[in-house]
């Protein structure tokens, strides 16, 4: 390679800094901003790009979905749907969740039913189960967002992958197996959250990440979209009227939603070497699709793109608060300020040795960092302990980021690339004190990392002198008001404005089941054998998200079918992915209000930016906020990846990490706090070992809770093992 060619390659790569991101840099070990490496390394990166397998530095920053792309993708989906005789609704989003098009085919069902028992299994009552007035447009958007948010340049996951990893057993259909690695992730990106953004409408995109109307979807029929190996968005289709999941993956399904949505990916395919079906966890291979494109009945390349008006196949459909039907929208380029994800300001995050870290942040519409490091807003220990300082938050983020850039990823390809994650730090009020992310972490991890951090802090508040104890906070929240199925939902959908509320009033809210949030407090205290657990007067206990997740499984220990449920979970026969327990019950009423807001075109006000505390569909107190828990504003999360932060024996905050394997997330949070404490001369620390949840002796000789679990040999640049032992 000539010197001029070397310079050209280096210049090209430097332009990629703000682009899609992910994977390794040359040897895969650098924690620094990319610099000009050897010509051999740089040539290798470009060759990888030409193979369609990006490693994070192989596309220009302008890579995005154009209007023509979106029109073609939707046209391909419609052609396959027509060929199979299943009219439906299709949605396309960009990588940060801007809705670019929603198309409703002629004859498509307008509403869908949420159910986990469409396979003929015994139906579950309560939660979201049986709710049958969900607009199909919202289901299609949720599917598209899921395909986009779970995928990166290192992995391509679909809604079928999501179905596999959120159920009570991994794999679904097996018995006496632990739950899915992302158990509970379906209740993230919630429309009532405070981190996710809200669309402005009018055919304009705005900074993300955006909220999803139904959280993340486990219903097959949602896929990521790629251009030149770079993820640029997602596509979702629903036509069968069921918003469900696959409860048994021992066979391959003939799910028409899935094959029809798959048609939209032709020409925008995920690289085969990045798809879920080449990625494993605990020795099991993920699923991407139960079809392949050879099963398509149509030639997608020759499919007619949709037109904005006078399309005989159907029409663009307005979705209040998400999409205006007057135009097809161009997507944003991920990693640029317009997307809401941008390189961290120069000098913001540095390693312990002073080298600048390759980090990204969330930015607002002006390009300013939304969550720069700041001091805590709380008064830890009844005001006797200093809150986290801004410089301490910065060091925590730096140490966590350094660890991520050293660690071997679990769910990325090629093998040997770095973990890619989002990192949130909060105080005891749940206020965000700082946020950072690696170059190509999956988009879902931003909101989830914040959920995780807040969850660890909240459940570690026993005996910490916090103004309102966890128990008192939960007791003050209104009960979820579960909806019953309505009679003739399609007739209701023909005139939502006049028929929806009367139809709901006939049977809703359900009188059984009708849990109270306070029930979970009582159940937790009994299960733990600690009458004052979660109380202001109780003895301090520290709960990582792995610990709280143990308590939130339908079996304890996790996966043992003959055992009872954890205290924060529904019992057998009442539990499903759509009715999990405390996690959903905290946010249920806000979800329903948001659906009503969209369905009735704004006649019902939209939810605020705090999910818990909504009175729900209560005719006497309709959708009011009561005793809201702002410290859990975007809901709780129940899979691992967070720890509380202490100053001595006093709780001062928490850190949450999400985006890679859950053991990696655990280690980055736990070891990140430890390393930050060392760097800050022990000014902060992990929870004292004696008060960690794994020290609680449970009644009836039940196995102990878990606190964190770190990978055995985690580093790319060292064979050091058991790095969390003894800390």
Predicted segment positions?
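Bacterial N-terminal signal peptides that target proteins for export
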Residues: 1-11
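C-terminal motif of bacterial Sec signal peptides marking the signal peptidase cleavage site
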Residues: 16-19
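Bacterial signal peptide processing site
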Residues: 21-25
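Flexible, solvent-exposed loop/hinge segments and secondary-structure transition points
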Residues: 37-727
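Surface-exposed loop and adjacent secondary-structure segments within mature catalytic domains
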Residues: 28-29
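Terminal low-complexity, poorly structured segments
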Residues: 9-13, 42-43
